């Protein structure tokens, strides 16, 4: 990435980060108000999913958690590269830390087609901020009867907590993906889109049994709220 493109990318990400940080705060306030007014206990069921995962992580997944996290990590590279960047995937590899040979610290990799030495920040940093299994569950939630939503929301909370553990483990300065894109740019990108994705998820599970709000309704609500807030700031500046 040239210095000019890097500067423009960082500048736009900083602007976007300011917006998504404010909107994340608004999203949290929305969730708190919804819980206080007892509109739907979806957030409660997500919380149950968080607790179930923490218990499972400690007592049931201990032997295989590293390869599960590696598969999720490499799966994000593959998903974004194949679906959004239209790359051809040649190889997908994931292994447990127990299988590493002496001097080898590579738990997994994805081999794909790309043009020259071009590095896509989208696919390179996808594992650090894209909870793709959670979004797939939110799409699956569209097909579920209202009476069964609590079960799905527990699983959604379970999957999201899994990603929190993955992000905590993988997001390090010495991580090869982060070093490849640059530490400052990487953290800026990761934080920005992590807040963005979490906001969409929080909106998507609101409503529920009384007034179901699905992933598409959540996305719409997020962008409508964001646009209204931007217009409010513009009006304040003009006046």
Residue spans for each PLM region:
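Helix-to-loop transition at the C-terminal end of transmembrane segments
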Residues: 58-65, 208-213
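Metalloprotease/metallohydrolase-associated module, dominated by Zn2+-dependent proteases
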Residues: 1-32, 37-42, 48-49, 96-239
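Active-site recognition of the HExxH zinc-binding catalytic motif
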Residues: 65-85
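Membrane-water interface of transmembrane alpha-helices
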Residues: 82-86, 90, 166-171
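Transmembrane alpha-helices and immediately adjacent membrane-cytoplasm interface residues
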Residues: 48-61
């Amino acid at each position: 990435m040239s210095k000019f493109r890097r500067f423009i990318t960082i500048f736009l990400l900083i602007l976007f980060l300011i917006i998504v940080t404010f909107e994340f705060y608004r999203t949290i306030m929305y969730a708190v108000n919804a819980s206080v007014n007892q509109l739907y206990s979806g957030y409660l069921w997500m919380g149950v999913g968080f607790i179930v995962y923490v218990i499972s992580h400690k007592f049931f997944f201990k032997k295989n958690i590293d390869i599960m996290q590696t598969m999720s990590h490499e799966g994000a590279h593959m998903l974004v590269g194949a679906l959004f960047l239209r790359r051809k995937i040649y190889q997908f590899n994931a292994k447990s830390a127990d299988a590493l040979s002496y001097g080898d610290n590579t738990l997994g990799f994805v081999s794909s087609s790309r043009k020259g030495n071009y590095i896509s920040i989208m696919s390179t940093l996808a594992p650090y901020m894209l909870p793709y299994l959670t979004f797939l569950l939110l799409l699956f939630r569209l097909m579920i009867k209202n009476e069964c939503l609590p079960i799905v929301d527990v699983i959604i909370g379970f999957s999201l907590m899994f990603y929190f553990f993955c992000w905590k483990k993988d997001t390090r300065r010495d991580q090869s993906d982060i070093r490849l894109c640059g530490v400052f740019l990487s953290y800026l990108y990761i934080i920005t889109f992590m807040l963005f994705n979490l906001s969409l998820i929080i909106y998507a599970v609101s409503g529920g049994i009384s007034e179901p709000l699905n992933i598409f309704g959540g996305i719409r609500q997020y962008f409508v709220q964001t646009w209204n807030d931007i217009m409010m700031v513009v009006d304040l500046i003009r006046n």
